[in-house]
Amino acid sequence: GMAEAMIKHLPESTVRRLGIFAHGEENVKVHRDEPVFDGQFSNRCYREAVKQAFTHFSEKAIAQNRFDPDLDIILTEQWARIIMHLPYAFQAKRMFPDVFRHDRQHLESWKHVESEIGVMPEESDFETIEEWEKAMDGYRRAISKTESFKQFVEDRIEKGQRASSLIGNQYTGSIFLALMSTFEADYEENANLDNVTFGLCGYGSGAKAKVFEAEVQPTWREIASRWNLFERLEGRIAIDRVTYEALHKGLAKESIVTPKGEFA
């Protein structure tokens, strides 16, 4: 029954002529994959991927003579702003302590941090990997509460999370939103970003991260002035759950708001 009905809809092929179930299976299993979300595991994947991507970028920068660790200012201090993939607004702030430590652990300034929160836990000091990971989580939280880290976030990350905090959880395009948020915030505050370097970190499927950098062109003000991002976010219209589900399932027959300036 079901096998024949399925085969009827398949295009003509050798597989169809020979019988798609000719390998002996008598039962047809119909199923679908459902994602299982584990927040803590997901955050750990993000954190490790970002740290590895930053390490790889540093090694590549040294190999290409872009960066000399003995002579140059550390990379995260060279970047005027750091633009991150933000599935939620404070992801970068919460996930960046590892990179912050990694980039500074050889500096004199890091000794001041260690005098405040202690040295990093060593895996060899713990009986199990779980105990060490728990201690490391506590150490990252301690880093995030230091004045040096909080100032670092304020200077380089905070502006990128403003738009995300107004929108809520999102995934696709979040790095671009963080970039727009940063530029518009700096435009409104009349900051000078001409020719400065941004560090950027993308993240996506398969827990893969990519760190790269970009130089801001002097025309950035002209472009950012046209966005009106925060003004547009203020003009949003709230919808109820029924309307949301109709939109999500593609059941809505009419636009919720009057289309204006649409591309299609």
Describe the predicted segments one by one.
Residues 90-92, 205-210:
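Flexible loop/turn segments at secondary-structure boundaries
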Residues 1-56, 61-64, 112, 207-264:
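Condensing-enzyme catalytic core mediating Claisen C-C bond formation in acyl metabolism
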Residues 34-42, 80-83, 157-170, 174, ...:
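Cysteine-centered functional microenvironments
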Residues 67-98, 126-132:
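Conserved beta-ketoacyl condensing-enzyme motif
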Residues 119-147, 165, 173-179, 183, ...:
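Non-catalytic terminal extensions of PLP-dependent enzymes
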Residues 96-102, 214-218:
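Short secondary-structure boundary/capping segments
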Residues 53-78, 97-101, 113, 182-190:
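Phosphate/pyrophosphate-binding loops at sites that engage ATP/ADP/AMP, CoA/4′-phosphopantetheine
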Residues 67, 84, 105-113, 121-158, ...:
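Hard-cation-handling environments
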